[in-house]
From Swiss-Prot:
SUPFAM superfamilies: Carboxypeptidase regulatory domain-like. Residues 1-29 form the signal peptide. The keyword Transport applies. Induction: Negatively regulated by H-NS. Positively regulated by IHF and EcpR. It comes from the Bacteria. Keywords: Fimbrium biogenesis, Signal, Transport. The keyword Ribonucleoprotein does not apply. This is Probable outer membrane usher protein EcpC. Disruption phenotype: Mutants do not express ECP and are defective in biofilm formation. Belongs to the EcpC/MatD family. Part of the ecpRABCDE operon, which encodes the E.coli common pilus (ECP). ECP is found in both commensal and pathogenic strains and plays a dual role in early-stage biofilm development and host cell recognition. It comes from Escherichia coli O18:K1:H7 (strain IHE3034 / ExPEC).
């Protein structure tokens, strides 16, 4: 039956009739035209409204609860009166993260209700644990449920980041530059250099990636190499890539170790996508708490409070992102109105895992194309020429509880290869990793590793082993090595002891092995800094050569304000050296770190080596580049100098800016228009970044959501009023460069004394500027905020006459006293006051 609009007259009758809903008249007083439903007298006007149909709110109510203060709205219901029978036409549920959830059975019953009638008590039974109760007096519908009918509000393990916020063409260019110079003992030298460029140009979620390098710039042996040229679209949980790819862009799920060096021209498609974010920081086993009313949940471990969280009525999964990793029990305590309602023990299962995390759907990728294999050689014994081949394969990965796995199957050069990777945590103390490869030319490989934390938590142990045998087709070398190591935290046994670490590596293919042993102990930590002791020994043996043993001992002193100093001795190559090192760090400025080291032989035969060696370095962070300058004189007499620098350039339309940061291949250009060295700050997802001058570029990681807020800098004397563009919400894909153009006014608090042209003071005068007004005192003195872009003050008098003060604020910052200033255009203040007029703007 269609819903008709109420006429004004009908609305008045309806409002009048509603009075009768709250008064139960006796039978003699009842209107003969009224109708009784569920013990409530329904006036004729309201009955007509019910026949037309109306929408009422739907609330969930826990059976046994007193009152409705903890009820939650979960939707609405459309009710109507059909031949004296009140019915529900349909129910519309409203999803909300904060609402209680109903079980799937109850949800299905609600969604399938169609023209269901209420009984005489205005109730519709749904299941043994849920029913609908209608209150005509309050005009609301309650879903009354027992605890068994409640579902559980689980936390989402995945989320799509959505559409890009940048709808125009934009680009990010990252650059990395390096220069190396080696000065030989005989006076000769050689220099090499490189420039690596990575460009990502994007239109919304579509982007093209170009990655290459130039070598030997400025020399006669200049060369260039293009490593990647591909189109990619990663959106809504699926990714497509095509072009010249590397193995990581071809697939990133399973191991792929049997591919030799070369170039791949192909395509890749799958659901291994960065546009869908999987949260692996929650416990694999959800921690669930039931609250009969709104209250708190406390998580406690070994008597220590780990978390306090607030929930509404219902079954809720507790947020475990902030809890420590591991497998352990926590006590879950539910508190309502200050009373402990329930207390139970549940297990937290949080382990570091590869891939998407527990509960994620099966990940897959299919890929293939043309493979240009480079020439290959193994120690000059086996060589293979460059060759063209086809390439096709598929990858997949998944998890089951804490067990995770990945597999890759592919073929090229008429060979079939299968590879797997398995990860299995055993309890909270042992982790097992296995990686295997098998090829049709009888090649095989096995890599196994086990790590364990021993009881007591003061020691750990790890074991690795790799065995590889290659047939007559794959371009890869045999391998046979094993390693074992461990760490013993003696501090757990006695607070005055330190940490001891040992490792042993044996490469049986090359008949080489080495072991290391290191000890570190904190000697002092207090107000004046910290002092630590380091000592260790290494022993190497390569093939049939004699063993080489090195030893060292050092004291490390860390002082406040970023100072660090180390002194010690090392013994290697048959002689002992004394070593000194120092480092200073700076929080601000272009130079962020400077350091130096000096070594001198004090005993033993140095042979051809020099007795004195050392070096110095500096790390810089400039506006357009950051990097390191290092100069080192080694014991062999060579002097090595190298400079590395990197940065990024962002572009969108007419906006282009550069940065010394390389945080990602997306970013934001801030066009603030600040003059000279003006500075404000950008707060991005809680982190503070300084913005200097008119334009800044800030690279950011792609596939991310960002909340950007502009604010005054605590390191600047200037004060700014950010009129518009203060807050922005951005979603960035690779190559997306957003532009934020806020309206920023640089404010200066100006104080002074204003006079007319004849020197008389403008006492008690209303003066104005671009952004506000104020009144001078009886001495003509004033204080007001002025926008530096409009450094004028004006005074209006005699109707439409104006005088003006031009302020010199170019060098002003924060607050300034300008002294006596003249309002040009006003000959005398006395002439204004004699007229007795009220002056105002």
């Amino acid at each position: 039956m269609p819903l008709r609009r109420f006429s004004p007259g009908l609305k008045a009758q309806f409002a009048f009739g509603m009075v009768f809903l709250f008064v139960q008249p006796d039978a003699s007083a009842a209107d003969i035209s009224a109708q009784q439903i569920g013990g409530v007298i329904i006036p004729q006007a309201f009955s007509q409204a019910l026949q037309d149909g109306m929408s009422v709110p739907l609330y969930i109510h826990l059976a046994g609860s007193q009152g409705r203060q903890d009820d939650q709205r979960i939707g609405s219901a459309f009710i109507w009166l059909d031949d004296g029978q009140l019915r529900i036409r349909k129910i519309q549920l409203e999803e909300s993260e904060d609402n209680a959830s109903v079980s799937e059975q109850t949800r299905q019953q609600l969604m399938t209700l169609a023209n269901a009638p209420f009984n005489e008590a205005l109730t519709i039974p749904l299941t043994d644990n849920a029913q609908l109760d209608l209150s005509l007096r309050q005009l609301l519908l309650q879903l009354v449920v027992k605890r068994e009918a409640l579902g559980t509000v689980l936390r989402s393990r995945s989320e799509d980041i959505g559409q890009s916020s940048v709808n125009t063409l934009s680009s990010n260019l990252s650059y990395n530059f390096g220069v190396y110079n080696n000065q030989l003992r005989n006076g000769g030298s050689n220099t090499s250099s490189y420039l690596s460029l990575n460009n990502v140009t994007a239109l919304r979620e579509h982007h093209v990636v170009l990655d290459g390098s130039l070598y030997g710039i400025g020399s006669g042996q200049q060369d260039s190499e293009l490593y990647k040229a591909m189109y990619e679209r990663d959106f809504a949980g699926h990714r497509f890539a095509g072009g010249m790819l590397d193995t990581w862009n071809l697939q990133s799920l399973g191991p792929m170790t049997a591919i030799s060096a070369g170039k791949i021209y192909g395509l890749s498609w799958g659901n291994q996508a960065s546009s869908t974010i999987f949260d692996s920081s929650q416990s694999a086993t959800p921690v669930i708490a039931f609250l009969p009313a709104a209250g708190e949940v406390h998580l406690t471990r070994d008597g220590r409070l780990l978390s306090v969280q607030n929930f509404t009525m219902g079954n809720h999964e507790v947020d475990t992102r902030g809890l420590p990793y591991g497998i352990y029990d926590v006590e879950v305590e539910v508190i309502v109105n200050g009373r402990v309602i329930s207390k139970r023990t549940q297990r937290v299962n949080k382990l570091f895992s590869r891939g998407r995390g527990v509960g994620a759907p099966l990940a897959w990728q299919i890929w293939g194309g043309s493979f240009h294999m480079d020439r290959w050689s193994e120690n000059g014994k086996k060589t293979r020429p460059a060759k063209e081949s086809w390439l096709a394969g598929a990858s997949t990965s998944g998890s089951l509880s804490t067990f995770s796995w990945a597999a890759t199957g592919y073929g090229y050069d008429n060979q079939a290869v299968g590879e797997t990777r398995l990860t299995l945590p055993l309890g909270g103390a042992i982790n097992v990793n296995l990686q295997n490869m098998l090829a049709s030319d009888s090649s095989w490989s096995n890599i196994a590793s086990i790590s364990a934390t021993l009881p007591g938590g003061f020691s750990s142990l790890w074991v690795n082993q790799e065995k590889t045998r290659i047939g007559n087709q794959l371009r890869r070398s045999d391998a046979d090595n094993r390693a074992i190591g461990g760490t013993l935290n003696l501090n757990s046994l006695w607070s005055k002891l330190g940490t001891f670490s040992i490792s042993y590596n044996d490469d049986r293919r090359y008949n080489s092995h080495y072991y290391t042993a290191d000890y570190y102990q904190s000697v002092y930590s207090g107000t004046f800094g910290s002092l630590g002791l380091r000592a260790g020994i290494q022993r190497y043996n390569n093939g049939d050569s004699s063993a080489n043993t090195g030893k060292y001992i050092a004291l490390d002193l860390s002082l406040p304000l970023g100072n660090w100093f180390s002194a010690g001795m090392t013994h290697q190559n048959g002689y002992t050296m004394a070593n000194l090192s120092a480092r200073k760090q700076f929080d601000e400025g272009t130079i962020r770190t400077v350091g130096a080291n000096l070594s001198r032989a004090i005993s033993g035969d140095t042979g051809d080596d020099k007795t004195l060696s050392g070096g110095a370095y500096a790390q810089f962070d400039a506006r357009y580049a950051s990097g390191t300058l290092n100069v080192n004189s080694a014991a062999d007499g060579y002097i090595n100098t190298n400079l590395t620098a990197n940065g990024s350039v962002g572009w969108q339309g007419k906006n282009i800016a550069a940065s010394g940061r390389t945080d990602g291949n997306a970013g934001v250009i801030f066009d603030t228009g600040l003059e000279n060295d003006g500075q404000i700050s950008a707060k991005i997802n809680g982190r503070i970044f300084p913005l200097n001058g008119k334009r800044n570029y800030l690279p950011l990681s792609p596939y991310g959501r960002y909340e950007v807020e502009l604010q005054n800098s605590k390191n600047s004397l200037d004060s700014y009023d950010i009129v518009s563009g203060r807050k922005s919400h951005l979603t960035l894909y690779p190559g997306n460069v957003a532009v934020i153009e806020p309206e920023v006014k640089q404010m200066v608090t100006v104080s002074g004394r204003i006079r007319a042209e004849d020197g008389t003071l403008l006492a008690n005068a209303r003066i104005n500027n671009h952004i506000g007004r104020t009144r001078t005192d009886e001495n003509g003195e004033f204080v007001m905020d002025v926008d530096k872009k409009y450094p004028t003050i004006d005074f209006r008098y005699s109707g439409n006459k104006t005088c003006e003060v031009a302020l010199e604020l170019n060098q002003a910052r924060g607050a300034v006293w300008v002294g006596d200033v003249v309002c040009s255009g006003l000959s005398s203040w006395a002439a204004v006051t004699q007229t007795g007029e009220e002056n105002e703007s």
